[in-house]
Amino acid sequence: MSKLYEWISPDSDVLEQEKTELRPPSMYKVVLNNDDYTPMEFVVEVLDKFFSMDLEKATQLMLTVHYEGKAVCGTFTAEVAETKVAQVNTYSRDNEHPLLCTMEQA
């Protein structure tokens, strides 16, 4: 009989494992902020490209950004939210638009 088998045999003493409480991850809202220079069409493009919104939903959210100053694009875990914020801000700068994307705790 192998030593490994003897070590895990039912007759051996088993240490009780400590139970850890699993909590859901903290969630963050990704927010688009209005500015006076970014074209509305570009905002719709960003919502389609980075948040997979259809034209109707992207247009509605773009109008919310325009009239209310900001709008939530989605709620994600911290890592996903950080990635989306960075992608949108980089894409906006690469296209010479001042569109600002931020995140805040949900």
From Swiss-Prot:
It comes from the Bacteria. InterPro entries: ClpS, ClpS_core, Ribosomal_bL12_C/ClpS-like. Gene3D superfamilies: 3.30.1390.10. One of its GO terms (biological process) is proteolysis. SUPFAM superfamilies: ClpS-like (SSF54736). It holds the Pfam family ClpS. Transmembrane segments: none annotated. Binds to the N-terminal domain of the chaperone ClpA. Belongs to the ClpS family. NCBIfam families: PRK00033.1-3, PRK00033.1-5. Involved in the modulation of the specificity of the ClpAP-mediated ATP-dependent protein degradation. This is ATP-dependent Clp protease adapter protein ClpS.
